[in-house]
Amino acid sequence: MAEENKATEQIYTIPLREVKDYPVWKRSNKAIKVIREYLSKHMKIEEEKIKISSELNEAVWEHGIEKPPSAVRVKAVRSEEGVTAQVVGAE
């Protein structure tokens, strides 16, 4: 029987509170790294294979480099190429 290539989807609420411990000029950059680390751990995949959508990137950077959100809801879709992370509600 042939196996189907299913893309698995999972919704996560990723806490970004630890980013507040970093200098203000590094916070949004660190928030993106925290998202990659979180998805890598929970989806069991290397960080290099995680793609961050432009909508998710804009949501993190919406208030600039100094004030990223304290949490973000992410829809992670696993495919053969890796994992794509999107903001929940963005299509």
Swiss-Prot record:
Gene Ontology cellular component terms for the protein in this record: cytosolic large ribosomal subunit
UniProt xrefs under Pfam families: Ribosomal_L31e (PF01198)
GO molecular function ontology, one term from the record: structural constituent of ribosome
Protein's UniProt keywords contain Zinc: no
UniProt KW keywords: Ribonucleoprotein, Ribosomal protein
One GO BP annotation of this record: cytoplasmic translation
The family this protein is said to belong to: Belongs to the eukaryotic ribosomal protein eL31 family.
Protein known as: Large ribosomal subunit protein eL31
Organism (species): Methanocella arvoryzae (strain DSM 22066 / NBRC 105507 / MRE50)
